[in-house]
Amino acid sequence: MNTKKSKSSFNVQDKGLDPPGQTLSCLPWQHEEYDRIRRQQASGKLSHALLVSGQAFLGKSHFAHAIVSAMLCESAESISNDGVLGRSACGDCTGCHLLAAGTHPDFRSLRPEDSKLIKIEQIRDVIAWVGQTAQRSGKKVVIVNPADQMNHQSANALLKCLEEPAGDSLIMLVTSHPGRLLPTIRSR
């Protein structure tokens, strides 16, 4: 088996990302919400935090990554002839290539460590990172998945960041169990 990849190929499954340009084709029930978020982004009215919740295995992670891909794509904000924002990332620009390679400087993904919890050190690191200037896209994006796996200290540290957002950033909390999040996080 040949494991060598061409420069233009995308092997993003290992990175936990969805291939740019193929973002929502398998989730037609998500298009309306996706379009609403993209319109908010285009008008400058997108909140600094989003809670993506729902039953397990309905595409929450895929949806979150579709938003990240479109936000960090350097050509996805073009408006089509009918006035609608581009639905998905192009897959060809530098931003898409960096995201596919898992090296985009304006994106971080927080997942539980070996203990199966997202620890306070991870949250503190991402809070410090969010406070720095974005390098490519003008916006820094963080996905916390599953957000309900934060321990109490992590959740409180994240709450401070949600109450006092730093810079132009978006924090997406993805969970199948929103009731496990602190009520103060859910209300932000």
Give the positions of each predicted feature.
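Alpha-helical scaffold elements adjacent to nucleotide-binding pockets in ATP/GTP-utilizing enzyme cores
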Residues: 63-67, 125-126, 157, 161, ...
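Conserved catalytic/switch belt of AAA+ P-loop NTPases
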Residues: 131, 156-176, 183
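Long, charge-dense, solvent-exposed interaction surfaces that engage phosphate-rich ligands
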Residues: 188
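A short beta-strand-to-loop transition that corresponds to the Sensor-1 phosphate-sensing loop
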Residues: 145-147, 173-178
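Alpha-helix N-cap/helix-start and coil->helix boundary motif
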Residues: 90, 178-179
